[in-house]
């Protein structure tokens, strides 16, 4: 039975919105900050609880909102039994962790920052478990990796914290990338990315040839997140985080995300031999290996970390069995593990907080000094060991029973034997947690005088310990909830019978053997530890570090070989790749005969071609002279502009010409500090470069000719633009309509890149001026003779007289651009050239005094205007940057057209002007620092004021 609930997105959004509060409320005090962190969590939990009765009764709630339907990405949420379980754990235990953290964190720890990270992580986890779209789930999945990175590395002053955070991000991030591929394959097989649809296509998915590929990729993501072998090593190193983080992320939330994913997709992926051998085997290996390592860990949190890995392996193994009964046990143990493990982590934090150490060898006898903590720790540790009458005993015995039905490669004894071995070591490390920390005589060398903490720290673990006892003594209370969750996992109605006594059976004997064997192992711990140390404990971190180091070294060698800051090297790589790709296509493909007649060769284009080739050849011959090479580049650009005019492309011609003027002026400023000539290249390098250049040029020429004399295989898009330019964009200048409407998003990206380039120029020049380079500039002597008159009077007068006309020309070009050649980009270049001429003619000091414009702001304003124009289309129900137009009449004027594209063009105009002028100001500042004098000619301003302006600009 399905129902619609508008609360589901609110449950997900509440923690994200609440993350804004702790940082603001910390000024009001730690208690206020804590309450404002509790508020969004409690609100989300309340909304979840309101749905609980209906969900337990079998109802499934949905919320659907189309977001990017063309990509299959929709904001779809689903609340069923499985989602209720995990969301309840995330929010319920989250409340206890927030209260615990209030008293755990010291006053030196930035509490507002901690709670912000915690709520971001909480929201991402709730998003995962309530998502009904695998693409949406992937977004939340990656958000958990990022937010957990911040939480694990919260104590960033500790090297262990930074290393643990990086390791967790690297491992889970790698798994996330693999999982993306698996999810895309899964959605492609099912024909939808909605989870509810995927769950209805079991037969199609398992019959697909891509089933195994999708399964492996998805399991890599799940195994890395849930720390399964061989990816288990990151979780213990994440214990460098504060204990509230460990208790939250590594008992009930982050490490359970992989289990959730396997449980969510269990109906369509399980039941095959591939699923059994991959999942059950991995879980069993993880369970045993981690349990063995945990026994020999002397760090309290390290012991609990490996115990967590072991229990996650246990649950993974149960899910891998692929039976409904095993799925029921997995669900039940998820609940039990979350309750006792969160409490154990918090008691470990209490011990560390009150004694000053987590080293088990420095502890002991704490039952007399910390009786409340001892009771809580004893109850929860005994539950972890599987001792009756606690909840851990029930799920452990049910697990052992399920292993007796599992046959691995024809062997019915292997899995029960190894599972019993894992349970035996689980008992041993659980008993060690109690015996070596709390039992024995009181010591006199504790780092701090131990005592029980205040109520705020032990209230949370005490509540969880009470749940451990309650479920253990009265397990039938949990039956309806476990049944609802198991029904969601199995897509069936499995029978659920939870009871403390299951009778005398094989599972009971296995359980007794585990308890007795675990006690015996603890008694022999000293001797076993000596053997363990001599054997050399496994150190997966060394393998991981070696792997990462090898990859880093290899990438560095590759980067050094390809990326050496040499434009020649980059051009060579591009030429080789282009020629190689073209050669492969030419030799393996098929090309039809020419279908078009080339245009006849006439005198004018021939002259242009000769000039172009001549200028290029001269440039190659005299390229060592930097100034001459720059002039020849300008000649090449001018000839290209004329060719554009000849071929009826006035927009391109004006743009090309304007760009040539701007770039030459800026390059002249940049070349001022370089030697007049380039170094002489060896003959071998010249021959190599000439060969590559010739091959690249011939390849491009051949491709261009082949395209010009043949019709396109697909219909040309030109007809669409010509037909829809006026109807869709309201303009007859097709080029401009393409820039501001059809391909407006490209233009939007280009102005952002242009702005970033200008800001980079500013940042680099500013760093040079304020750094050691500033002293070099102050002592720099030019190797070129100075001009007799830096600012000729004739040029000064001409530029000032032409300034208004140039600005009017820019405005005219801007306004006519939608229907005639022009537009915001060209107009911006024209206005920038007009301003450049003022700086060139009268000097920076004179121009800056009269044009105090913050060009950073101009760039930002241009991008904001363009962005606002694009967003405005949303309010009209259209995609981003879709323009609209209409006709208006204001008497006595004639009817005229207004288009929203004009506002976008304003943004382009501002961004272009700001970028050019900021680059000019940045480069000219280096010349002024190098000792260039401010213009003191009669038409100049007061020299003192000009000097002040110069000093202010340099400051």
Indicate residue ranges for each PLM-predicted region.
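Membrane-interfacial helical/loop segments at transmembrane boundaries in membrane proteins
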Residues: 61-71, 194-203, 395-406, 477-500, ...
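Short aromatic-rich membrane-water interface segments that cap or initiate transmembrane helices
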Residues: 2-4, 66-85, 201-215, 402-416, ...
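Transmembrane helix-loop-helix hairpins at membrane boundaries of multipass inner-membrane proteins
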Residues: 1-7, 20-116, 185-208, 233, ...
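Hydrophobic transmembrane alpha-helices and their helix-loop junctions in integral membrane proteins
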Residues: 96-137, 146-452, 473, 584, ...
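Hydrophobic alpha-helical transmembrane segments in multi-pass integral membrane proteins
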Residues: 59-125, 260, 280, 571-572, ...
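Alpha-helical transmembrane segments
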Residues: 88-89, 136-141, 172-173, 212-221, ...
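Cytoplasmic/organellar membrane-interface segments at the starts of transmembrane helices
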Residues: 367-373, 426, 430-518, 527-558, ...
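Flexible extramembrane loops and terminal tails that flank transmembrane helices
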Residues: 603-609, 618, 673-807, 811-818, ...
């Amino acid at each position: 039975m399905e129902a619609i609930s508008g609360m589901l997105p609110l449950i997900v959004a509440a923690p994200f919105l609440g993350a804004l509060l702790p940082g603001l409320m910390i000024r009001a005090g730690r208690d206020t900050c804590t309450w404002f962190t509790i508020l969004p969590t409690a609100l989300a939990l309340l909304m979840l609880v309101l749905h609980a009765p209906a969900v337990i009764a079998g109802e499934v709630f949905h919320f659907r909102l189309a977001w990017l339907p063309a990509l299959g990405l929709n904001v779809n949420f689903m609340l069923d039994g499985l989602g209720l379980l995990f969301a309840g754990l995330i929010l319920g235990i989250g409340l206890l962790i927030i209260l615990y953290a209030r008293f755990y964190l010291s006053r030196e720890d930035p509490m507002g920052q901690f709670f912000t990270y915690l709520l971001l992580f909480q929201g991402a986890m709730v998003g995962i478990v309530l998502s009904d779209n695998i693409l949406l789930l992937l977004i939340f999945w990656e958000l958990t990796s990022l937010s957990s990175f911040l939480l694990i590395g919260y104590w960033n002053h500790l090297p262990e914290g930074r290393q643990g955070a990086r390791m967790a991000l690297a491992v889970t991030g790698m798994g996330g990338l693999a999982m993306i591929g698996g999810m895309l394959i899964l959605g492609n097989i099912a024909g939808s990315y909605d989870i509810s649809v995927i769950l209805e296509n079991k037969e199609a998915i398992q019959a697909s040839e891509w089933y195994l590929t999708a399964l492996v990729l998805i399991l890599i993501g799940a195994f890395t997140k849930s720390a399964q072998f061989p990816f288990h090593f990151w979780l213990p190193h994440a214990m460098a985080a504060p204990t509230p983080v460990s208790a939250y992320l590594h008992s009930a939330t982050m490490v359970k995300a992989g289990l959730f994913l396997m449980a969510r997709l269990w109906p369509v992926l399980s039941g095959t031999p591939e699923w059994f051998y991959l999942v059950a085997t991995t879980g069993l290996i993880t369970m045993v290996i981690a349990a063995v390592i945990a026994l020999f860990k002397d760090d309290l949190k390290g012991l609990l970390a490996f115990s967590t890995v072991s229990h996650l392996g246990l649950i993974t193994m149960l899910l891998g069995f692929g039976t409904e009964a095993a799925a029921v046990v997995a669900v039940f143990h998820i609940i039990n593990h979350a309750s006792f493990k969160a409490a154990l982590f918090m008691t470990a934090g209490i011990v560390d907080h009150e004694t000053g150490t987590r080293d088990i060898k420095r502890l002991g006898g704490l039952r007399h000094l910390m009786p409340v903590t001892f009771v809580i720790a004893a109850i929860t540790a005994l539950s972890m060991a599987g001792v009756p009458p606690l909840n851990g005993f029930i799920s452990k015995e049910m697990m052992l029973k399920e292993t007796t039905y599992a046959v691995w490669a024809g062997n019915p004894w292997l899995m029960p034997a190894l599972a019993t071995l894992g349970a035996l070591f689980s008992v041993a490390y659980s008993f060690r947690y109690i015996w070596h920390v709390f039992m024995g005589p009181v010591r006199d060398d504790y780092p701090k005088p131990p005592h029980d903490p205040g109520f705020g720290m032990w209230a949370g673990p005490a509540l969880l310990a009470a749940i451990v006892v309650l479920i253990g003594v009265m397990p039938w209370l949990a039956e309806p909830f476990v049944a609802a969750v198991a029904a969601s996992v199995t897509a069936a109605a499995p029978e659920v019978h939870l009871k403390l006594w299951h009778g005398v059976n094989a599972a009971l004997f296995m359980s007794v053997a585990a308890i007795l064997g675990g006690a015996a192992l603890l008694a022999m711990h000293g001797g076993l530890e000596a053997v363990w140390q001599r054997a050399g404990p496994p150190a997966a971190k060394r393998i991981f570090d070696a792997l990462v180091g090898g990859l880093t070294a290899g990438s560095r060698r590759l980067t050094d070989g390809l990326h050496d800051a040499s434009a020649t090297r980059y051009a060579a790589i591009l030429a080789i790749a282009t020629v190689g790709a073209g050669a492969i296509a030419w030799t393996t493909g098929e090309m039809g005969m020419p279908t078009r007649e080339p245009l006849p060769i006439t005198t004018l284009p021939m002259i242009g071609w000769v000039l172009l080739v001549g200028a290029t050849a001269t440039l190659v011959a005299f390229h060592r002279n930097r100034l001459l090479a720059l002039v020849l580049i300008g000649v090449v650009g001018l000839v290209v502009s004329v060719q554009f005019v000849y071929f009826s492309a006035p927009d391109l011609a004006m743009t090309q010409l304007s760009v040539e003027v701007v770039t030459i002026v800026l390059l002249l400023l940049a070349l001022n500090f370089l030697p007049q000539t380039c170094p002489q290249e060896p003959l071998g390098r010249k021959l190599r470069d000439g060969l590559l250049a010739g091959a690249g040029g011939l390849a491009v020429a051949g491709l261009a000719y082949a395209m010009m004399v043949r019709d396109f295989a697909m219909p040309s898009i030109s007809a669409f633009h010509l037909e829809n330019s006026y109807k869709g964009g309201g303009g007859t200048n097709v080029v401009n309509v393409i820039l501001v409407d059809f391909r407006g998003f490209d233009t939007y990206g280009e102005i952002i890149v242009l702005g970033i380039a200008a800001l980079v120029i500013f940042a680099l020049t500013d760093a040079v001026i304020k750094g050691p380079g500033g002293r070099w500039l102050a002592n720099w002597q030019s190797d070129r003779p100075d001009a007799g008159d830096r600012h000729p009077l004739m040029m000064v007068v001409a530029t000032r007289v032409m300034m208004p006309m140039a600005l009017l020309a820019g405005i005219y070009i801007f306004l006519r651009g939608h229907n005639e050649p022009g537009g915001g980009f060209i107009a911006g270049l024209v206005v920038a050239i007009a301003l450049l001429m003022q700086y060139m003619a009268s000097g920076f000091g004179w121009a800056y005094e009269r044009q105090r414009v913050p060009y950073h702001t101009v760039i930002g304003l241009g991008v904001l205007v363009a962005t606002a124009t694009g967003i405005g289309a949303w309010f009209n129900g259209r995609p981003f940057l879709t323009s609209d137009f209409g006709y208006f009449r204001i008497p006595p004027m004639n009817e005229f057209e207004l288009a929203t594209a004009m506002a976008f063009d304003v943004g382009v105009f501002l961004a272009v002007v700001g970028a050019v002028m900021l680059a000019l100001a940045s480069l000219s500042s280096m010349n002024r620092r190098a000792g260039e004098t401010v213009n003191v000619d009669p038409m100049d301003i007061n020299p003192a004021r000009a000097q002040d302006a110069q000093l202010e600009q340099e400051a």
